[in-house]
Amino acid sequence: MTASTASAPLAFGDLQGCRTQFQQLLAKAAPPADAPLWFAGDLINRGGESLAMLRDIIALGDRAVPVLGNHDLHLLSVSAGIRKSKKGDTIDEILAAPDADDMLHWIRHRPLAHYENGMLLVHAGVLPQWDVDLTLELADELQRALRAPGWKETLAGLYGNEPNRWKPGLKGIDRLRLTCTALTRMRFCNADGVMDFSSSGGIGSAPAGFMPWFDVPGRKTEEITVVFGHWAALGLLIRDNLIGLDSGCVWGEQLSAVRLAQSAAERTVTQVECEGCRADVH
């Protein structure tokens, strides 16, 4: 089946353990059986059905195309003793499951970025200085490090806000940390690609001199379609070459999915309400 005749992917925002709402949304969107299902990361945590949610996605096999989000990496870090569970986390049932090792192995082998048919899927964003090729190269470096025998040491070194800007000469763990920060945590940066982490609010909460990563003039991925999640306060954002899918399901808002047709005019949005998955802690 060629790309031109295959069913368009259906891309979902952050699920965060909201399994019931995911099932409702999948039934409502009713994609063809051969349609790939893309997930913008944060499959688990904060919602009450994280274990069942994770098992459902794994059971989809190759049809599921998830990228890693910060909550997925947090689960790996807690499992490795690098981080401790936080108030509001709902990952203990995963860690206590008899098949925990298999599930954690599966998560550790998911990509940080996926590119197909002119569409790039990431969890949080792409630095404005990165084109598609560099984004995929950097994501691949981090993916291989997380799949290697020394993955725990790598994972422990990914936390922190420095370096906060891209430089081609970055090497080692600094390079991997910068890649992870951009792909899984970024919201705002300035025109030079310096990231800011002081705000997780909507566009209006940008610190002086900063803007959403996707609004930086001359962004090198502006000619392709970038699909992302992570930014619940932003809400659903649909532009011709930009699709922000985190509409705050775990905040009791909505869970969103978009049919990723090649033509922006043919893309369709499906949503369900998420009042039943409101978490106590955000």
Swiss-Prot record:
Catalytic reactions on record: P(1),P(4)-bis(5'-adenosyl) tetraphosphate + H2O = 2 ADP + 2 H(+)
Entry annotated with the keyword Hydrolase: yes
EC numbers on record: 3.6.1.41
Domain of life: Bacteria
Hydrolase among keywords: yes
Pfam families: Metallophos
InterPro entries found in the cross-reference section: ApaH, Calcineurin-like_PHP_ApaH, Metallo-depent_PP-like
A GO molecular-function annotation: bis(5'-nucleosyl)-tetraphosphatase (symmetrical) activity
Alphabetical UniProt keywords: Hydrolase
Disulfide topology: none
Similarity field: Belongs to the Ap4A hydrolase family.
Its biological purpose: Hydrolyzes diadenosine 5',5'''-P1,P4-tetraphosphate to yield ADP.
Designated name of the protein: Bis(5'-nucleosyl)-tetraphosphatase, symmetrical
